[in-house]
Amino acid sequence: MLNAPFELVTSLGFAAFVLLLIALPIAFWSVSSDSRPGVVRLLVAVANLLLTAQLVLRWWQSGHFPISNLYESLCFLAWACTLTQLLVERAWPSPIVAAAATPMGLGCIAFASFALPDQLQSAAPLVPALRSSWLVMHVSVIMVSYAALLVGSLLSLAVLVMDRGEALQLRSSSIGSGGFRQAVTTPDSGFLELQSLEISTNEQLDSLSYRTITVGFLMLTVGIISGAVWANEAWGSYWSWDPKETWALICWLVYAAYLHTRLSRGWQGRRPALVAVVGLIVIAVCYIGVNLLGIGLHSYGWFF
C-alpha cells in the first residue's frame, strides 16, 4: 500500500489549493460588489471534494486514518475548514462569510503543500504510540473543533472589521433569512402577534460566529476528555502538563471566557469578538507553535 503513487495525493492537494486561491479574490470582489458568492461556494465545494479524495487515497496508501503527522492533519484541517465554511454559508449565503473563512482553508493546504518537506508528505506506518482506536476519536474531533473555532473566530474578526459602533443584540432565530420574528402586543386587541424584523449584517455575523464557536467549543471539550482517557491508557496518567495539553487547556479557557461573556454578562459585538480573536492566536500557538519546540509527548511526527 505504501507504494501507491505519492504524486496523486499531493496533486489533489495542489488542485484544491488552486481552486481556493481562485475563490479568495472572487469572494472579496463579491463583498465589494454586494453580489451573491455562488461561484465561490462552487469552488470551495469542489476543493472540499478534492480534499476528501486526497484523504481517502492517503488512508488507502498508508493503511491508517490520515491524521498521524503535520501534513495529514493540515490536509484534514483544510477539509474540515472548507466543510464548516460551506455549512455556515448554507445558513447565511453572504459573500462576507466566504471572504472571512476562505483564507483559513487556503492557508492550511498551502502550508501543507509548500512548507513541509517531502519526507513528511510521504505516507509512513504509524508509530507505536498512535496505534490505538483512540486516534480517530481524539485527533479527528480535536481537528474538527479547531475548524469550527477558527471559522467562528474569523467571523468575529469580520465583526471587528465591519464594526461602526453599532449596538448589537443577539437574536436567536431565522438566521439566514435576514430577519427574525418577535412577539409584540398589538395596541388595539391586546393580543400577541409575531412580527418580522430585519437584522443588520453585523448582527448576523455576530450570531453565526457565536453559534459556530459554541459547536467548536463543545467538540473541543469532547476531544480533550477523549485525549485524557487515551493518555491514561497509554501512559498511566490522565494529564501530564505536556506543552500541547497545556495550550489546549488555555485554548479551552479562552473560548469558555468567550461564551461566559455572552451568556452571563450579555456581551455582543466588539468585546466578545476580541476574545474570539485571542482564541484564534491561541489555536495557532497550540497547533503549530508548540510543535516548533520539539518537546513533549505530542512532538512526534510533526517536524524533522
Swiss-Prot record:
Q: Family per UniProt?
A: Belongs to the CcmF/CycK/Ccl1/NrfE/CcsA family.
Q: Report what the protein is called.
A: Cytochrome c biogenesis protein CcsA
Predominant cellular place of this UniProt entry's protein: membrane
Question: Which keywords are on file for this protein?
Answer: Cytochrome c-type biogenesis, Membrane, Thylakoid, Transmembrane, Transmembrane helix
Membrane-spanning parts: 8-28, 37-57, 63-83, 96-116, 141-161, 212-232, 246-263, 275-295
Subunit text? May interact with ccs1.
Q: Which domain of life is it from?
A: Bacteria
**Which one GO biological process term can you cite for this protein?**
cytochrome complex assembly
Q: Which GO terms describe its cellular component?
A: plasma membrane-derived thylakoid membrane
Encoded by which gene?
ccsA
Q: Which NCBIfam families match?
A: cytochr_II_ccsB
What kind of membrane protein is this, topologically? Answer: Multi-pass membrane protein
Instruction: Report the protein's function.
Output: Required during biogenesis of c-type cytochromes (cytochrome c6 and cytochrome f) at the step of heme attachment.
Localization, UniProt:
Cellular thylakoid membrane
Q: Does the keyword Amino-acid biosynthesis apply?
A: no
Any one Gene Ontology MF annotation carried by this entry is: heme binding
Short name of any one Pfam family annotated for the protein: Cytochrom_C_asm
